[in-house]
């Protein structure tokens, strides 16, 4: 049984297989050796080395001084980052299976007859294949067009040489673009890290600011409680003094009321001898009672508590002026301190 013929299908399947054997860098069929990346995509080792060198311009290859550190590049198919050791792309594993499939595919293609129309033909000369490239008009054409046709006065070159040259140029452009994409990806990663660090720093300063304001709130609450306690203490002392006076005056009023009642009863006494026996003492008691009205009194403005008034406008202004410090303010403050120290030093020498 011919196993090779069973491996290579016919028709469109051949074209699909060929697409799977195309290198994403040079856009041609893989050139041996073929290396397999950790992401399971394949590259020609030469193409892999080109994009590796483009992404790591300071890495020296086998021909130069040996670098003890590896490098990295991204797979052109999936953008997976490939990390190399000090051997570079020569440390990548060869994909022998793909190389064998390429050999079988080429054998099968060479054994098949060339299908009609598989090679591009000239539109002016239908039996002539396009085999040269007009450098003047920058279009592929045939030999008859150069000898007899529209491109007699044009400069031409072999189609294959121009084909290989432009393919090489395009491959170089792809390598440069892939390397550029790697640099852009690095910048994106740096910017993402910058966003993360910015958020972390913002959270940290917010926490610090909240703690400082909480400290201010605690100081204000403590001072408020202290001042309210002093007002309450003063109130209690004054009220105690006033209530003591009220008690004294009530006792005096009670004594005076009883004395008045006794005196009125004495006035109703019809007998002179009886009246006179108590009148002198009653008169003396009334005089003393009238003097008792001279008990202590509160001074004018005793009830006033205005001396506990606070002027907090300057503190309120200072609170409103709270703001974040700037580097310029810190520099000015440092310069002022330096000037003051210099002045003190000068005076000391004098």
UniProtKB/Swiss-Prot annotation:
The keyword Transferase applies. InterPro entries: COS_domain, TRIM/RBCC, TRIM63_RING-HC, Znf-RING_euk, Znf_B-box, Znf_RING, Znf_RING/FYVE/PHD, Znf_RING_CS. The keyword Chloroplast does not apply. Pathway: Protein modification; protein ubiquitination. A zinc finger (B box-type) spans 117-159. Residues 267-325 form the COS domain. One of its GO terms (molecular function) is ubiquitin protein ligase activity. A zinc finger (RING-type) spans 23-79. Disruption phenotype: No visible phenotype under normal conditions. Under amino acid starvation, mice continue to synthesize muscle protein and degrade less muscle protein than wild-type, leading to a decrease in the blood levels of free amino acids. Besides, mutant mice display higher creatine kinase activity under amino acid starvation. It is found in: Cytoplasm; Nucleus; Cytoplasm, Myofibril, Sarcomere, M line; Cytoplasm, Myofibril, Sarcomere, Z line. Residues 325-344 have a biased composition (Acidic residues). Residues 207-269 form a coiled coil. Induction: By hydrogen peroxide. Up-regulated in response to amino acid starvation. E3 ubiquitin ligase. Mediates the ubiquitination and subsequent proteasomal degradation of CKM, GMEB1 and HIBADH. Regulates the proteasomal degradation of muscle proteins under amino acid starvation, where muscle protein is catabolized to provide other organs with amino acids. Inhibits de novo skeletal muscle protein synthesis under amino acid starvation. Regulates proteasomal degradation of cardiac troponin I/TNNI3 and probably of other sarcomeric-associated proteins. May play a role in striated muscle atrophy and hypertrophy by regulating an anti-hypertrophic PKC-mediated signaling pathway. Homodimer. Homooligomer and heterooligomer. Interacts with SUMO2, titin/TTN and GMEB1. Interacts with TRIM54 and probably with TRIM55. Interacts with TNNI3. Forms a ternary complex with RACK1 and PRKCE. Interacts with CKM. This is E3 ubiquitin-protein ligase TRIM63. It comes from Mus musculus (Mouse). The gene is Trim63.
């Amino acid at each position: 049984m011919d196993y090779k013929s069973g491996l290579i299908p016919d028709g469109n399947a051949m074209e699909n297989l060929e697409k799977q054997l195309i290198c994403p860098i040079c856009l041609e069929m893989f050139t041996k050796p073929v290396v397999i990346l950790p992401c399971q995509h394949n590259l020609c080792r030469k193409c892999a080395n080109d994009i590796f060198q483009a992404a790591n311009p300071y890495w020296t290859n086998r021909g130069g001084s040996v670098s003890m550190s590896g490098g990295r590049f991204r797979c052109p198919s999936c953008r997976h980052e490939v990390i190399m050791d000090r051997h570079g792309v020569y440390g990548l594993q060869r994909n022998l299976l793909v190389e064998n499939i390429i050999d079988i595919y080429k054998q099968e293609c060479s054994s098949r007859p060339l299908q009609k129309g598989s090679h591009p033909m000239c539109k002016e000369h239908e039996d002539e294949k396009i085999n040269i490239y007009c450098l003047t008009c920058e279009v592929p054409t045939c030999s008859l067009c150069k000898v007899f046709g529209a491109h007699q006065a044009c400069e031409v070159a072999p189609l294959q040489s121009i084909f290989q040259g432009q393919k090489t140029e395009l491959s170089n452009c792809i390598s440069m673009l892939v390397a550029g994409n790697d640099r852009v990806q690095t910048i994106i990663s740096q910017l993402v890290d910058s966003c993360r660090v910015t958020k972390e720093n913002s959270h940290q300063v917010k926490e610090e600011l909240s703690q400082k304001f909480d400290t201010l709130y605690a100081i204000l609450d403590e001072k408020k409680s202290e001042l309210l306690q002093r007002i309450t203490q003063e109130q209690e002392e004054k009220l105690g003094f006033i209530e003591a006076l009220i008690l004294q005056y009530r006792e005096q009023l009670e004594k005076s009321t009883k004395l008045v009642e006794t005196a009125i009863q004495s006035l109703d006494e019809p007998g002179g001898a009886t009246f006179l026996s108590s009148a002198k003492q009653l008169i003396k008691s009334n005089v003393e009672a009238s003097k008792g009205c001279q008990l202590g009194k509160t001074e004018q403005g005793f009830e006033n508590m205005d001396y506990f008034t606070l002027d907090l406008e300057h503190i309120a202004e200072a609170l409103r002026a709270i703001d974040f410090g700037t580097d310029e303010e810190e520099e000015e403050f440092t310069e002022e301190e330096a000037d003051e120290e210099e002045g003190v030093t000068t005076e000391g020498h004098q």
